[in-house]
């Protein structure tokens, strides 16, 4: 009869998650997990059977951590902006979990950055339509394009190549947000992709540079 494990599966997954936080998913082995638990590797294989199963459980746990961030964003006064800033916060505070979920092929979880975007898109769509008075198609395009920028900035943060503060990032997102919204409102067919691109740019170029007034 095999000895009873003194750790629950939940405790083991929590230890594995902590290993990933410090060493990345590549650093998660039976030995590093056992070291974190202060035990041998035998209880790990008794509970899970293989490290592949452990990695799947860690991915699911990482998703739950990520969900706490996005849920906090959804509670903000402007949910779609809150979600974007929480996505960036997740990248800053949990870089290895971000790397696991969004920069690594999912470990059998069917999870990816694009799937995350589509899920969030569904959640914020009603608010976008109500606040900005736009159609479902326009709301989806608005969030998708803004999310591309959010994801790019978050990836720069995780790879250690983002020189911008949260305040500067907020300014970038505001500028992109205004640009997308203005295009949706003023360029016929923008959301559907049927607008005349050349004509749109000619109209902008024809306005010439803006002259800044002296104070």
Where are these regions (language model features)?
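Helix-turn-helix
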Residues: 11, 15, 19-53, 57
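Alpha-helical DNA-contacting segments of helix-turn-helix folds
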Residues: 20, 52-62, 101, 105, ...
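Amphipathic alpha-helical linker/stalk segments
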Residues: 56-83, 119-131
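Amphipathic alpha-helical segments that line or abut small-molecule/effector binding pockets
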Residues: 77-96, 140, 144, 174, ...
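Helical hydrophobic small-molecule/effector-binding pocket
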Residues: 81-103, 110-117, 147-154
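Amphipathic alpha-helical packing segments from all-alpha helical-bundle domains
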Residues: 108-133, 140-145, 151, 155, ...
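C-terminal peripheral helix-coil segments that are non-catalytic and often amphipathic
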Residues: 126-130, 163-215
């Amino acid at each position: 009869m095999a000895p009873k494990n003194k750790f629950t599966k939940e405790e083991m997954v929590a230890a594995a998650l902590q290993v990933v936080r410090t060493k990345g998913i590549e650093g998660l082995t039976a030995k590093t997990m056992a070291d974190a638990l202060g035990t041998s590797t035998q209880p790990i294989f008794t509970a899970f059977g293989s490290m592949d199963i452990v990695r799947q459980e860690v991915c699911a746990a990482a998703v739950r951590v990520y969900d706490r961030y996005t849920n906090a964003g959804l509670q903000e006064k402007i949910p779609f902006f809150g979600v974007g800033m929480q996505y960036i916060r997740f990248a800053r505070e949990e870089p290895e979990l971000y790397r696991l979920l969004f920069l690594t092929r999912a470990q059998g979880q069917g999870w990816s950055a694009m799937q995350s975007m589509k899920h969030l898109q569904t959640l914020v769509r009603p608010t976008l339509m109500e606040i900005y008075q736009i159609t479902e198609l326009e709301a989806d395009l608005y969030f998708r394009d803004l999310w591309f920028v959010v994801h790019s900035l978050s990836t720069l943060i995780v790879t250690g190549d983002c020189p911008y503060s949260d305040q500067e990032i907020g300014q970038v997102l505001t500028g992109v947000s205004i640009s997308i919204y203005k295009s949706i409102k003023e360029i016929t067919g923008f959301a559907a992709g049927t607008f005349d691109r050349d004509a749109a740019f000619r109209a902008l170029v024809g306005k010439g540079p803006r002259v800044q007034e002296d104070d």
